[in-house]
């Protein structure tokens, strides 16, 4: 990847199609920040929900996650699903780069081997974007735990997602 600075914006040449993969159960404001920043850097961005649709795990189904993401991002951003190897999806769809957010060195330690494996399997690069510090403490798991016990999740999820999370835990 050949980054260059143009004004205050970072441009990545020859990388037009990007995928932001994750389970997004559910999507948080930290995720949205990374997705929006990727959308400024690349010509086409797809948020890719990963997992197995036949094995309900987590708080939201795959369809619910995709709907919540669509409600939370710019209409120009695509939302799709993948239950197989990420590199198979990226090869089939002509994706140039993966985008992942990093909150801390722990995220880096977790994401680096996956990025290296993806590169080994298909040659695809992964771009790591540092999470805005105001979202550094936010993870889907922690936020769900707060919501489960009736805590205030304001500022953790997009509004529609926050309402959906609260509704899930009312049941």
How should these model regions be labeled?
Residues 13, 66, 83-171:
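Classical nucleotidyltransferase
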Residues 20, 47-49, 128:
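Structural beta-sheet core signal
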Residues 28, 69, 150:
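Residue-level signal for inorganic ion chemistry
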Residues 9, 43, 96:
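Conserved acidic residues
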Residues 17, 43-46, 125:
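Residues at the starts of beta-strands that form the adenosine-phosphate
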Residues 32-86:
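Short, surface-exposed acidic-centric catalytic microdomains
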Residues 1-12:
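Single conserved hydrophobic/aromatic residue that forms the stacking wall/gate
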Residues 18-30:
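Short, glycine-rich nucleotide/cofactor-binding loops
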